[in-house]
């Protein structure tokens, strides 16, 4: 899994993950990767204070252009992740000379998923930018691509954390 964070908080996030019992913790740029089961994913979403999102990678691949991204995404068995009665959205983060516009990448991923379902079922899932049923994230660094399920939904900084101490007067 991948816990995204702000630059400079990677070490703190790694310590939080260690305290939660996560395994195989590796610090990266504005992220910390770790392994764990479904319970760990829920704990990470609920307990981590310095994480922005928890991503569950579903495919790593390389792509030199948008057509390769499309083909790689279309090759995924999407019925394992999404139904035609659900909505989805794609968030793209791109650091590449070839892929300059993240919106274009988002559209290519969306097109591949919609085309997959149309060919298999004759129907398509809906796209909803705000509050989709399934939020996907694609990260591209030059030619290295990672497609992930976003297990957090909204950014974790929007959680309503309740404190037991009285409010200041």
Where are these predicted regions, by residue range?
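Conserved small/polar residues in nucleotide/adenosyl-binding loops
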Residues: 163-169
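C-terminal edge-of-domain segments
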Residues: 140-147
């Amino acid at each position: 899994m991948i816990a995204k964070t702000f630059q400079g908080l990677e070490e703190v996030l790694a310590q939080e993950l260690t305290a939660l019992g996560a395994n195989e913790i590796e610090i990266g740029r504005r992220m910390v990767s770790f392994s764990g089961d479904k319970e760990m994913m829920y704990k990470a979403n609920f307990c981590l204070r310095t994480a922005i999102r928890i991503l569950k990678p579903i495919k790593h691949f390389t792509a030199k252009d948008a057509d390769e991204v499309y083909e790689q995404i279309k090759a995924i068995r999407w019925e394992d992740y999404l139904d035609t009665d659900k909505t989805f959205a794609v968030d793209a983060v791109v650091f590449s000379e070839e892929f300059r516009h993240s919106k274009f990448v988002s559209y290519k991923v969306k097109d591949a998923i919609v085309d997959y379902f149309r060919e298999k079922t004759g129907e398509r899932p809906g796209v909803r930018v705000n509050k989709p049923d399934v939020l996907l994230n694609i990260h591209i660094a030059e030619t290295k691509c990672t497609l992930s399920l976003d297990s957090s939904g909204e950014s974790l900084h929007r959680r309503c954390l309740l404190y037991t101490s009285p409010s200041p007067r």
